[in-house]
Amino acid sequence: MKKTIFILATLLICGVAVGKKAPKQTKDLWPDGTEIEAWFKDTASVKLEGLGRQYRVTDYGVVNDGRIHTKELQALIDKVAQDGGGVLVVPEGVYMTGAVFFKQGVHLYLKAGGVLMGSNDPSDYPLLQTRIEGETCKYYSALINADGLDGFTISGKGAIDGNGYTFWKHFWERRAWNNKCTNKDEQRPRLVFISNCKNVQIEGINLQNSPFWTTHIYNSERVKLLNLHIYSPAKPVKAPSTDAIDLDVVKNILVKGCYMSVNDDAVAIKGGKGPYADAFRTKYEGVDLSKFPEMQGDGGNENIIIEDCVYGFCHGCLTLGSESVYNHNIILRRIKVDEANNLLWLKMRPDTPQQYEYVTVEDIEGNGKNFILVAPWTQFYDLKGRETTPMSYSDHITMRNIRFDCNVFFNVIQREDQYHLSNFTFENLDITAQKKEFHTEYVENFSVKNVNVK
């Protein structure tokens, strides 16, 4: 009898109601209704001791003397790879380098106060065939490059600093006499470029002052960006096109616990541009695609979660485009926003067939200029001889559980000759806006529930 009483008491203490079934845990689902796999819940930190033999960079000629040590740093990466792998450890101090290229089995760890500082000399970043603005082309390499690697990590409490001021200044000086100057005319290195990789984790460090895009992930899968501080200034000198995170032909991406404040988009979903950029999923009879080599490598993006982040100034918290073709299952949730231009920005290119579908933005507080912006994006418009304008689509777009102060609530331009909007859901929105206009007729099948705009 005593044993029975003890068991019952234990069950009650543990919160299990005797005679009742335990409540089922709700599954975490993608916007299309499929289940999110457990991989997205595993946010365990990288352990330095688990990365293999440690190579302190100062023991191999990379010293804090203000000189550029690209050769020494690359030689160390090559040595570690030849020796079977390990981790480069950057101690406290500032260490200057140009572009370096990591190899299989070689990791990077930056201790608190340890900074890898990029050279401000363009010749320290070799030109190579790479991926920029939705095209395959020649461009500068990044400061940190990883291509074709499995299991690559960057971690620690230090910083990678792009030392971008000189590059920014040159860009704006050139713009002053040529207002059509582009990022390809005034090339600048990215900070981190991850391409053709899988099982990558970048965590804990500061990524700052990039000359161009800060973190570019291309043709990669299973990448986690955790607890990063990503920054470039919007004043007194604007850091042009310093997107925090560019996701370009990727699958299974987690961005969690990051702070982002940059002079462009915080998270931009890319993938390609041009009249046949969707050739990876659409057959074009009678079209010689070999005439468009810049579109080789275009692709879609699937299964992306951005959560538990804090945003300072940026152009877009989540931007689809401008070089984007197909995006499926994108979630932005549990974020705080201060001074963003746009919470959700759908850039619709009239020269590119685009499909944005199953996008959810939820559980958000903050302020910005536009709650949602949907509009044509005509920069570098080029049909490349195609006679008809390709149609684009945005479908199953959900925004819910949001409290937001903004200038414009519904900044949506209707262009049925270029794109079609369908199956939007606005639910549980508490909005304070200067411009409150709301055109549900712009969207086919628009569900509106508990939306308060004041």
Question: What do the predicted segments below correspond to?
Answer:
Residues 2-5, 11-12, 17-89, 94-107, ...:
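Extracellular "leader-to-stem" segments immediately downstream of a signal peptide or signal-anchor
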Residues 77-81, 96-105, 119, 204, ...:
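Short, T/G/N/S-enriched strand-turn elements that build extracellular solenoid repeat scaffolds
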Residues 85, 98-99, 119-121, 163-167, ...:
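Short glycine/acidic-rich loop motifs that flank beta-strands on beta-rich extracellular proteins
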Residues 94, 219-221, 271-273, 322-324, ...:
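Active-site-proximal loop/turn and secondary-structure-junction residues that shape catalytic pockets
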Residues 112-113, 150-159, 198-208, 221-234, ...:
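Right-handed parallel beta-helix
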Residues 210, 321-326, 347-355, 415:
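Glycine-centered low-complexity coil/loop motifs and glycine-rich tracts
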Residues 371-374, 384-403:
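Generic long, charged, amphipathic alpha-helical segments
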